[in-house]
UniProtKB/Swiss-Prot annotation:
Function of the protein: Dehydrogenase; part of the gene cluster that mediates the biosynthesis of enfumafungin, a glycosylated fernene-type triterpenoid with potent antifungal activity, mediated by its interaction with beta-1,3-glucan synthase and the fungal cell wall. The pathway begins with the terpene cyclase-glycosyl transferase fusion protein that most likely uses 2,3-oxidosqualene as substrate and catalyzes glycosylation immediately after cyclization.
Gene Ontology biological-process entries: terpenoid biosynthetic process
Originating species: Hormonema carpetanum
Gene Ontology CC entries for this record: cytosol
Pathway annotation: Secondary metabolite biosynthesis; terpenoid biosynthesis
A molecular-function term among this protein's GO annotations: hydroxypyruvate reductase [NAD(P)H] activity
Pfam family, one: 2-Hacid_dh_C
The keyword NAD is assigned to this record: yes
Protein's name in the database: Dehydrogenase efuE
Transferase in keyword set: no
Lineage: Eukaryota, Fungi, Dikarya, Ascomycota, Pezizomycotina
Amino acid sequence: MVESSRWYSVPETLSAKAGLPIVSLPFNNQIQTSPFSVRSSYYLPLQTVNMSPSLVAPRQKALSLRHPTMAGKEYLEEFSKKYIIDVLDVPNREEWLKQLPKKVAKDGPYSALIIGMGTGPYEPFDAEFCQALLPDLKLVVSASAGYNEFDVSWMTENNIWFCNTVDAVSEATADMAIFLTLAALRDTTNAERSARAGNWKAGFVPCRDPTGLRLGIIGMGAIGKHIARKAAVFNLEIVYHNRKRLQEADETTYKATYCPTLASLLETSDIVSISVPLNDETTGMISESEIALMKDSSILINTARGAVVDEAALIEALESGKIWRAGLDVFCNEPDINPYFKTSDKVVVQPHLGGLTAVAFRKAYRECFENVASFFDTGKPLAPVNDVTRAKGTPTASLP
């Protein structure tokens, strides 16, 4: 008897006739757990049951890099009734490249690949990373909003759909932007260090209030809209710059005024908050020339990607006082960030935690699975970044 870790659902009518409960059973074999099966956490080997291959139809299969437990046990159980999810749980890229061919040979092929959170040890997601899954791989989904570590052009050229998460981490990231804004305004980095050192309010002067200040949002996608909605509570005046202007109704909803150029936003904003994806167009978007346009003693908030901002130019502006404070959740060369940001009292620092909440993670993983389900059912995911039905090699997503 050959063991298998593939799971199939016994039809209800067959289970009823046999007097058995309706459970998920392995194909033509006895029940077993597998280190590569997401279901191994949820099913126990209660009895040995033999099934004929003719009684069940094969289901489409997805491979997940590490266990997608954040999606929730009940959700995964429900998803697994219709589709097969296998897991390859390895610590780094080297092990992935070593183990993937064996996994595909044993349990493949796989037409979908699920990439969860915490991707640093595995990046980049390119031809080498996916090679052993070809030619069957047709979809890659990521639980992250940003996708600069994914070679989307290569995927498009190879007729592979790519999906990031559209809205899962948006509100959590917006919360981080608001937190950094308030922390910068209230100079909490200095305040906390002083309090921990036992210097209670020593040398402190009144901080800045948000009321009446102008907040300029660069990138009015899902994150930018959440920022605008939340910022209005603090009586901030909202302006925004976007590749495409919002509908008038949306501008009314978010109480946001459109700036037709980036320069017009920078010149008039007291606080500049960045929420754009990282791509060729946005890399270095805020450099020395853009910072020169900003109001004196302004505040810069970045929850997008580190490379959107020229860090050397930012440091120079902080030291000169051109920029009064910065609130940063993202950096170049993470986690080895510039030592200046670790020590400067002029910077509020967070270790890229914007989307790291339990609710955001659950939503992100489920959004991945919904894209997989849509692809398995219809041949197209719900929210692709690229379009493999159009000209190859050109991702369709740019600025929001």
